[in-house]
């Protein structure tokens, strides 16, 4: 029985659900973990997460398919990425298989919060890990919590995705050889000033450039870029300081194996921006957000696809990946994980 929620008017924000998952790391090992009902986290004031930002997270969705199943999309890649993030911040990896089993457990427990099929909504699943014991000197914590919260969210774009205006920026999202390739809370904190400034100037997002030379495209504060050339190729930026987006990897596969497109994953110079036919941002929340204009220090670049609608090739990519996620198009093996 679904909760008494107005699914048609559900926003993209936090709604507390009944259960969350908790596992604790202490004395060099993880406990068995399990579901809890308390949504509050109580920690010592000197916990590593507070003092030195030792926290990482993931994001994925659970949703109903047309035939009444609840599924998730490629959670194995979220598990791998969380492990990679943990290693970089000197945090313990989870026991093998724990991530997916925990996701299944918490989604099943909160299945009444999974929006009905056809509303464009989903149950957002947020796994995260943090250092929890008191740490006054700069060093890794000794104790950790791995938690998963869930919250029902409406469609990222109500009424469909309309092209947005973005800008290039001299702010840096990540340093060379830094933490840009992992999903750490500190990366997102660094982007808050820049995104607030962008919004104040009338832009939806920042296009970060490489910190060393300011000549190559990186990503935004929370999404990878995709570019469509005038001859129909999909191009995605390559850099060691870009977060390896699961949505971007999936779109590259869809482009090549479902739509027969040529795909290039390579460094993208800023001088190329004026030559692309379509530009978009990709990520878990919106799948693809089309870009219609890029403001640069040399002037505005008007993307040929325009400011009215998503470009035709971007739309095919969007519709195909969405169809795969919702089991309306046959998925590659292992992409769809059934919860219940």
Predicted regions located by residue number:
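Intrinsically disordered, low-complexity linker/loop segments enriched in Gly/Pro
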Residues: 109, 131-132
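Extended, Lys/Arg-enriched charged tracts that mediate electrostatic binding to polyanionic substrates
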Residues: 115-126, 130
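Short, charge-rich binding segments
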Residues: 112-118, 138-140
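Helix-start/capping segments and mature chain N-termini
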Residues: 1-102, 106, 135-340
